[in-house]
A protein has these predicted regions:
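Jelly-roll (double-stranded beta-helix
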Residues: 1-415
Length: 415
């Protein structure tokens, strides 16, 4: 994120002395400066000023993130996943957003997981890539070394690689926190075509700087009612060995002899932020607009789009639902969040469903949907889409919640 922010106590000049307040006439101790930067020293970065040495590790041990293995989508089929079936109601209160994620789909570039959570997560740091966590339902407080967020329905939280943070659900037991987690092996950012060469959102972008929420900080241990010298465990996800079921992704638990919320100030252009899908201004036209018109983020070999309530095609002979199309270079994943998705009527897909349309197979409206859409002026639908440019494989959760029927849902017409 190229938009500069500064919070808390920082020195006038970078890489110069920044000290704690003097005590009894004695000079205060130095704060410890940390550069958190992307692409070595060649891209966005922030400087954080810690009370403690950020490299400190008192103890460590291996941990597992469970079954992260994947299975090829073979035979090649479109799939309908039902992630709402994955979490028994009794288990939700003990499940957290981080360790409770269940892998739906993945490849070497991106992994898509689902979680229904009622418990506080451990302190967590993803050392593999950036994350986007979309809040389907519920509310949470997210505490990070940059500051805190209050997140709720429709929020995308974008978390840079190696950001220490934790999730604390704040909704009722009847309204658990439902999240879909997009974990990249790269960075995630707004599409380059939305930005000037200096990183400002351009006029044609469907959202802009005013729509982004930045962390509220600084946030210190005492601000959350905890002690700054408490031993604290931080769970780190990273590449490694492990059994075949790990998918090459393992964890290490670091014990710190202090609380991770020890940043008295920071500044720079790298930090987590929130964007709410309701602030996305849809692009419409006289005839049907293709998915790139609905893009919100991009990563290496994948994009994220959202389809929001909007006025639809207004040519007198327009067909508002999509035409049939073959993703010759990509797999398409659609998460149906809310509303009435016209193109999928009759397929069994509803709120909370996820469809996978793989490359090599043409997909489009269900039988009768095109005719039924004629004359429609508005679509009341909300969906999040991820298109990948390498084939996706099925994770354990994807295999567990596949309805097994979707591939035949187009078979009732054309005879």
């Amino acid at each position: 994120m190229a938009h500069y922010q500064a919070m808390g106590s920082i020195p006038p000049k970078r890489h110069t002395q920044h000290r704690r307040p003097a005590k009894r006439g004695r000079m205060g101790e130095l704060y410890y400066e940390e550069l958190m930067g992307e692409e070595g020293f060649s891209s966005d970065s922030s400087l954080l000023y810690h009370r403690n040495i950020p490299s400190t590790v008192a103890e460590y041990r291996d941990v597992s993130f469970g079954d992260l293995s994947t299975t090829p989508n073979h035979p090649l089929l479109p799939r309908h996943l039902r992630p709402h079936d994955l979490f028994p109601a009794k288990a939700v209160k003990d499940t957290d957003v981080v360790t409770g994620r269940r892998l739906l789909l993945g490849n070497g570039d991106v992994r898509l997981s689902y979680a229904v959570s009622g418990a506080k997560s451990p302190w967590y740091r993803n050392g593999i890539g950036d994350e986007v966590v979309y809040v389907e339902r519920g509310r949470a407080r997210v505490e990070t070394v940059f500051g805190a967020f209050e997140v709720g329905e429709g929020d995308y939280l974008v978390v840079p690689r190696s950001t220490t943070h934790r999730w604390i659900p704040t909704g009722s037991g009847r309204d658990p926190l439902r999240t879909i987690c997009i974990e990249a092996s790269s960075h995630i950012a707004p599409p380059k075509r939305y930005l000037s060469k200096y990183g400002q959102f351009l006029e044609h972008s469907p959202y802009c700087e005013r729509d982004l929420r930045v962390p509220q900080g600084p946030l210190l241990a005492e601000d959350v009612g905890e002690k700054q010298d408490d031993d604290t465990e931080v769970l780190i996800k990273h590449r490694g060995g492990g059994p075949a079921s790990s998918g090459g992704i393992v964890g290490t638990l670091h014990l710190l002899p202090f609380h991770p919320l020890d940043v008295v100030g920071w500044d720079g252009c790298l930090y987590p932020y929130v964007f709410n899908v309701r602030d996305y201004e849809p692009v419409t036209g006289r005839i049907h607009q293709p998915p790139p018109a609905h893009q919100v983020f991009e990563g290496w070999n994948f994009v994220v789009c959202n389809f929001v309530p909007r006025k639809v095609d207004y040519h007198p002979l327009s067909i508002p639902v999509p035409y049939y199309h073959s993703n010759v270079d990509s797999d398409e994943v659609m998460f149906y969040v809310d509303g009435d998705y016209e193109a999928r009527k009759g397929s069994g897909i509803g709120k909370g469903s996820i469809s996978l349309h793989p490359g090599g197979h043409a997909h489009g409206p269900q039988p009768g949907a095109a005719e039924a859409s004629l004359g429609k002026e508005y679509f009341d639908e909300l969906a999040v889409m991820v298109d990948t440019f390498r084939p996706l494989e099925l994770g354990e959760a994807g295999r567990a919640c596949d309805d097994g029927l979707y591939a035949g849902s187009w078979n009732r017409a054309g005879r």
